[in-house]
Amino acid sequence: MKALAKLRPEEGIWMMDAPMPELGHNDIMIKIRKSAICGTDVHIYNWDEWSQKTIPVPMVVGHEYVGEIVAIGQEVNGFHIGDRVSGEGHITCGYCRNCRAGRRHLCRNAIGVGVNRPGSFAEYLVIPAYNAFRIPDNISDELAAIFDPFGNAVHTALSFDLVGEDVLITGAGPIGMMAAAVCRHVGARNVVITDVNAYRLELASKMGATRAVNVAEEKLTDVMIELGMTEGFDIGLEMSGAPSAFRAMLKAMNHGGRIAMLGIPHEPMSIDWGEVIFKGLFIKGIYGREMFETWYKMSALIQSGLDLSPIITHRFHIDEFQKGFDAMRSGQSGKVILNWDEAYTRHTSSCMCVDCATRHT
């Protein structure tokens, strides 16, 4: 089968002819319709320090996708051939204390699809049936393909009550932008997002941010005055992994504020713990999605009118994967979709014909 893989311990990702994955008794096999490129995939492409320590070579990568079930293991119940599914990318052990207590998102032994085991940049993917999530009929393939990062945004944003609150999001990557959309949708008052990337800040405004702030050009304190904020932010969502952004967040938080952290610093960082202690701040770490409460919330948010469509900015056929990675690596993109439909090759990725418009929904 056709697949994208990390074949060599150097920069790049390559197309290869991979063997079909083997189906276990408790597994399902998914024929992939659409994949999306994650920031993690870019790290793997770049072969940075984290990738060198983490990624086995060679291996098929990718973990954002939607497809249909084409085979079912003999012990599987609840799924049928033809079901349209995405899947939870963290495969848990099922026997550690957290798993047995129903907190599988905190599994001590979780392994990642496309990180520790073969991934979804392939024509076919096999995962445990437990990890599959059936996509409602009124949610498009494109949105379903980005449920993994959308789930990160939902888990982070909905960690705290948002109604009427002032929210600061540091980091306008795709997850930060989707978190901004979630916050506004569920009733936050002001949603301020910060970054230094002008393209993504403009896109964040389209996603619903009250103010998108380029901290290289504006002071966050001036924006707070502009918005009539006198006591600081109630909620902080740290999405950047940048120590300077987190330190700025701590200074901008109101007393008793709550912070959820998804961004991963590249190295250990120091902060002024006095800001945390004397303000009585609550800090929560976020890793992935809650299984499967976050997935049901994702579906409900979209079904209740949350519009994520601006976040998908580029579309390519899988054979044009290099263009997709170039777009992601440029920093001038939102989410990039790779289509596995062979009919898609008849048109360009920006084609506006009726057939392509249908495929893009």
Curated annotation (Swiss-Prot):
**Cofactor: record remark:** Binds 2 Zn(2+) ions per subunit.
Q: One Pfam family name from the record?
A: ADH_N
Gene3D superfamilies the UniProt entry points to: Medium-chain alcohol dehydrogenases, catalytic domain, NAD(P)-binding Rossmann-like Domain
Main localization (coarse)? cytoplasm
Residue numbers binding Zn(2+) 2: 93, 96, 99, 107
**Active site per database record:** 40 (charge relay system), 43 (charge relay system)
Q: Which UniProt keywords apply?
A: Cytoplasm, Metal-binding, NAD, Oxidoreductase, Zinc
Q: Where in the cell is it found?
A: Cytoplasm
Keyword Zinc among record annotations: yes
Pathway listed for it is: Amino-acid degradation; L-threonine degradation via oxydo-reductase pathway; glycine from L-threonine: step 1/2
Q: What is its EC number?
A: 1.1.1.103
Q: Which InterPro entries match?
A: ADH-like_C, ADH-like_N, ADH_Zn_CS, GroES-like_sf, L-Threonine_3-DHase, NAD(P)-bd_dom_sf, PKS_ER, Zn_alcohol_dh
GO biological processes: L-threonine catabolic process to glycine
Name the cofactor(s) required for activity, per the record.
Zn(2+)
Q: Does the keyword Metal-binding apply?
A: yes
**Which residue windows are coiled coil?**
none
Q: Which family does it belong to?
A: Belongs to the zinc-containing alcohol dehydrogenase family.
Q: Which NCBIfam families match?
A: PRK05396.1, tdh
Spell out the HAMAP family in the cross-references.
Answer: Thr_dehydrog (MF_00627)
Query: What does this chain do?
Result: Catalyzes the NAD(+)-dependent oxidation of L-threonine to 2-amino-3-ketobutyrate.
- This one is known as L-threonine 3-dehydrogenase
The scientific name of the source species is Pectobacterium atrosepticum (strain SCRI 1043 / ATCC BAA-672)
| Source taxonomy | Bacteria, Pseudomonadati, Pseudomonadota, Gammaproteobacteria, Enterobacterales
From the UniProt record, report the name of the gene that encodes this protein. tdh
